[in-house]
């Protein structure tokens, strides 16, 4: 959630952020009103409790003649306090709902507008000229790497089996990402893939896109769509030590997404699926270090993309395409020959203090005072990367060249029918 002090002092900046996202700026005024009403309700309840306490003291010291009137007043005050506390609870609920409804304030320079309003920051590599390219599914099936038919038989649409060297290719990607992360000071974590509602809400995934999340109703638990979620909850309600620098974690997990809003999109192959594996970088740092950490995360993603040897571009994602928690997001998109376009392989988001404020994750400043930490996240490898590898490294005879960095994991330089 956003910083209330910042909101009170800069309401126009928050309204502008809402507009750049395509969201309702009137929510800012609703929150300001709810904040004022909550503070008034707290003050009223506090004043009545103080009066009640003073009246109780008077009763103990009162003469027999004074006592009946004082007892009557004490009873009235008890009822008034009860009503004031109920009003305060109502005001708190209204305030919390209004606070949770506002997305993070976007960072200056983020392009305004929707999905197509991104800014291209860099383009790396030239797409190969491939005559009559095969798509990743045709290649994957011919090479015995991907089995969508049996995936659908077992689990339904958008599920699949990775088999043989297809499974080795994915495992190799994950291990490359783990190696890069641990070489750069990340702590490897294999987290739970089920989380409590307060953790899912704290990361910002139960807002407008709550229907994208799998929920186990009988247990009131959620399946994660990224290990960002459990890693954000890892230090919830804690004061962490950042005196030696940022805390960096790399989470390796299976991820689950309903893709409820994607009917008819990417129905072929493994570009958009319900289950996939991912290595996710997650960082806790001081707010003043967040921009530099964001650049570092992007740099590590680019190192990974260099290892799989595919053309890609880096974009500054438009405000209207950001998740509610992100203040800025960079995507790296790989060239997909059969689609003649770039598709997202990685994203990295600077969530500033938005998630940590919801989850009460703090650190101590140089004066020992607790402050809200900043959080960042970024993909280091995921199943979708197989799409870019297979399509960009396909050969005229239907084989696929294995990027050199993955050869030790796959056991061959060429995947052949």
UniProtKB/Swiss-Prot annotation:
Keyword hit for rRNA-binding: no
Record-linked InterPro entries: aa-tRNA-synt_IIb, aa-tRNA-synth_II, aa-tRNA-synth_II/BPL/LPL, Ser-tRNA-ligase_type_1, Ser-tRNA-synth_1_N, SerRS_1_N_sf, SerRS_core, tRNA-bd_arm
Enzyme class: ligase
Keyword terms of this UniProt record: Aminoacyl-tRNA synthetase, ATP-binding, Cytoplasm, Ligase, Nucleotide-binding, Protein biosynthesis
Pfam families in alphabetical order: Seryl_tRNA_N, tRNA-synt_2b
Subcellular location per the Swiss-Prot or TrEMBL entry: Cytoplasm
Pathway the protein takes part in: Aminoacyl-tRNA biosynthesis; selenocysteinyl-tRNA(Sec) biosynthesis; L-seryl-tRNA(Sec) from L-serine and tRNA(Sec): step 1/1
EC number annotated for this UniProt entry: 6.1.1.11
One Gene Ontology cellular component annotation held by this UniProt entry: cytoplasm
Family listed: Belongs to the class-II aminoacyl-tRNA synthetase family. Type-1 seryl-tRNA synthetase subfamily.
Comment field on protein domains: Consists of two distinct domains, a catalytic core and a N-terminal extension that is involved in tRNA binding.
Protein's name in the database: Serine--tRNA ligase
């Amino acid at each position: 959630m956003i910083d209330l002090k910042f909101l009170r002092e800069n309401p126009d900046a928050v309204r502008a952020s809402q507009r750049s996202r395509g969201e309702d700026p009137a929510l800012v005024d609703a929150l300001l009103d709810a904040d004022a009403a909550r503070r008034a309700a707290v003050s009223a309840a506090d004043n009545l409790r103080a009066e009640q306490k003073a009246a109780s003291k008077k009763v103990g010291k009162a003469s027999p003649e004074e006592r009946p009137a004082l007892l009557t007043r004490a009873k009235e005050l008890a009822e008034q306090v009860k009503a004031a506390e109920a009003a305060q609870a109502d005001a708190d609920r209204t305030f919390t709902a209004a606070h949770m409804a506002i997305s993070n304030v976007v960072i200056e320079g983020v392009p305004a507008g929707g999905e197509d309003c991104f800014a291209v920051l860099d383009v790396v590599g030239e797409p190969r000229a491939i005559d009559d390219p095969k798509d990743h599914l045709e290649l994957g099936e011919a090479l015995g790497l991907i089995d969508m038919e049996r995936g659908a038989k077992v689990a339904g649409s958008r599920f699949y089996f990775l088999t043989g060297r297809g499974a080795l290719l994915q495992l190799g990607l994950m291990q490359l990402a783990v190696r890069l992360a641990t070489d750069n000071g990340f702590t490897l974590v294999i987290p739970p893939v089920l989380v409590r509602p307060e953790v899912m809400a704290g990361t910002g995934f139960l807002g407008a896109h709550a229907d994208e999340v799998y929920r186990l109703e009988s247990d009131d638990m959620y399946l994660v769509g990224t290990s960002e979620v459990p890693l954000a909850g890892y230090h919830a309600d804690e004061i962490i030590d950042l005196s030696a620098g940022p805390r960096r974690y790399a989470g390796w997990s299976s991820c689950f997404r309903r893709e409820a809003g994607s009917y008819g999109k990417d129905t072929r192959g493994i570009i958009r699926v319900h289950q996939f594996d991912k290595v996710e970088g997650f960082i806790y740092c001081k707010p003043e270090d967040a921009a530099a950490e964001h650049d570092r995360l992007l740099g590590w993603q680019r190192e990974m993309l260099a290892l799989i040897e595919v053309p890609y571009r880096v974009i500054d994602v438009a405000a209207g395409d950001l998740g509610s928690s992100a203040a800025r997001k960079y995507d790296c998109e790989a060239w997909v020959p059969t689609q003649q376009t770039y598709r997202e392989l990685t994203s990295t988001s600077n969530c500033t203090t938005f998630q940590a404020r919801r989850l009460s994750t703090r650190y101590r400043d140089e004066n020992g005072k607790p402050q809200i930490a900043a959080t960042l996240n970024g993909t280091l490898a995921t199943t979708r990367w197989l799409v870019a590898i297979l399509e960009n490294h396909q050969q005229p005879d239907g084989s696929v060249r294995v990027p050199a960095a993955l050869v030790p994991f796959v056991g061959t330089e060429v995947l052949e029918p």
